[in-house]
Amino acid sequence: MTILNHTLGFPRVGLRRELKKAQESYWAGNSTREELLTVGRELRARHWDQQKQAGIDLLPVGDFAWYDHVLTTSLLLGNVPPRHQNKDGSVDIDTLFRIGRGRAPTGEPAAAAEMTKWFNTNYHYMVPEFVKGQQFKLTWTQLLEEVDEALALGHNVKPVLLGPVTYLWLGKVKGEQFDRLSLLNDILPVYQQVLAELAKRGIEWVQIDEPALVLELPQAWLDAYKPAYDALQGQVKLLLTTYFEGVTPNLDTITALPVQGLHVDLVHGKDDVVELHKRLPSDWLLSAGLINGRNVWRADLTEKYAQIKDIVGKRDLWVASSCSLLHSPIDLSVETRLDAEVKSWFAFALQKCHELALLRDALNSGDTAALAEWSAPIQARRNSTRVHNPAVEKRLAAITAQDSQRANVYEVRAEAQRARFKLPAWPTTTIGSFPQTTEIRTLRLDFKKGNLDANNYRTGIAEHIRQAIVEQERLGLDVLVHGEAERNDMVEYFGEHLDGFVFTQNGWVQSYGSRCVKPPIVIGDVSRPAPITVEWAKYAQSLTDKPVKGMLTGPVTILCWSFPREDVSRETIAKQIALALRDEVADLEAAGIGIIQIDEPALREGLPLRRSDWDAYLQWGVEAFRINAAVAKDDTQIHTHMCYCEFNDIMDSIAALDADVITIETSRSDMELLESFEEFDYPNEIGPGVYDIHSPNVPSVEWIEALLKKAAKRIPAERLWVNPDCGLKTRGWPETRAALANMVQAAQNLRRG
């Protein structure tokens, strides 16, 4: 029984973000569709070859996507919302982009589909839309074309397909309500057709992803798996693939399925591999997800070997990444600025492929010398002074309940804030960032490369901040922001100014579509050596009589959008960050900044996948925010911002944050999210986002007014703010001006009644 290895997927954006650049060039009309498609082909060929050279036996095909893999699946099934369809009924790459962005180089603009997080990761997908009586047919053959490409290149191919039950689980019903699970029998023939096409191509194994099987699913959904897979069996071998959690709670459902193998995440799940082996059918292949696909740390391969060795030779076995390597940067070897000690602690996607090759070879030969050599830096890290800071650990241990309590309740604070700011009804503001123009990015890049001295850099940033203030005053906004010209990324910027973080040059991972982020890496105890945002906030406030918000990224979001340490709990990291940012709140307040926004867009996405684990997470997540904010005086108004969220199941925790104002993403869901706040009788102020910043479409005054009137039916108007869904960093100035002018006009119209 020779053990093979494989990955569940590979990063698709390219080491230098080639995919992002090609997409954005195409969207802007600067390149042709064929040029875009060529970049995709080149990236796929390169990535297959890189994995093969690193020692991977079975290459994933179908993990590439032009926007996200759920949207690719929607097109595969012919599930295109009517508003995005071509007049002739055909489907092309612009159809896909219209669903994702609301517009494309061809076709009529229409509201983009809703976007949300992929399970508990920082990757997003476009939510499939389902209507009653919907028909499905094989429409978009990208998967088959890519399999043909890989076969022509001589690769050992393992196609990757999102499973039918998970696909339905991830979607939403539009219009007349019905049970979307009832569509299962309608989509299965398309899956059968795809599997038949793969069988024709001589494919032996298909990786069929059903990550919903790690959730606490309703019984009806669990019951749907057996008939679904009964319908899919027989054409190729199916590797039922799960990740992000363990499968033991749903193992009875899984073992009844007519599949030939099971992939389990042995990093994030608590499954005991020997017990799994005992319970799985003896003729099934077990794919052991031993290498963390979601982090950047070098694996302790001696530990991984010990974890799996007891079942070697007892069944067919593959070793694999825990999940797709999509969530990891591509290649550590191109990082030239990390010092040697720290660099030795990491492994990116290609290094993880090498780890899988080392592990496979050791399991097949019994020789573990190479594993011990690879794992040596991990032992050194455990004792490094780069990791441990006694002062931070002492301060954390000294936290009391008082440290997470504002001096007075919201009603008392609100009165003090009204007296201080004297804002009109329907106060207008933005979420924080303004367009990151080419000039701003060039300025930052020149400074980073040493082509610009500090004085000229600061002068340039100051001018962009001044322009942002002038623009906002001209538009008539009530509460201003400084625009964040100095920030490349809302998490990276803070990480760069906090001890305990390191950064990469090319550690890009995809967030959604063409958006890539370069997450900081938490390597040690976190502290703040000096004020971070105070100077620019104070400067911006000096330019205007209107209040300017101080802008902080909250502790849970910094944690969730970084690669965390694995040697301490997430709670410990979050509270260390909270203490560091607590000092920043105090310094902003002392500098005369009266409104401070602490963004926590990641609070909900950090939830464990199983509801039974939620309470513990929410308890420390809320406490971290409150530790951060509670130092503020009564007349300092604390805002928070959240996006892409379903709030109804965590409203207690949202209220427990005790922010004076919460701004939320609501426009894509047509204010649906406000139902949660209405039903809960949320006591503080709310700014429901009135337009979708992820789309370049400019909303009309009438559209915004209608949304605000809808909001006022749920939340008393005196507690409503008017703002976009999210920051405006990715938009251009012309559409930003137009959209904000309409937003301000809508607010003024409502004030006049």
From Swiss-Prot:
MF terms from GO for this chain are: 5-methyltetrahydropteroyltriglutamate-homocysteine S-methyltransferase activity; zinc ion binding
Task: Write the signal peptide boundaries.
Answer: none
Q: Which residues form a coiled coil?
A: none
Reactions catalysed:
5-methyltetrahydropteroyltri-L-glutamate + L-homocysteine = tetrahydropteroyltri-L-glutamate + L-methionine
Briefly, what is this protein's role?
A: Catalyzes the transfer of a methyl group from 5-methyltetrahydrofolate to homocysteine resulting in methionine formation.
The UniProt entry's sequence similarity note says: Belongs to the vitamin-B12 independent methionine synthase family.
What name goes with this protein? 5-methyltetrahydropteroyltriglutamate--homocysteine methyltransferase
**Source species:** Escherichia coli (strain ATCC 8739 / DSM 1576 / NBRC 3972 / NCIMB 8545 / WDCM 00012 / Crooks)
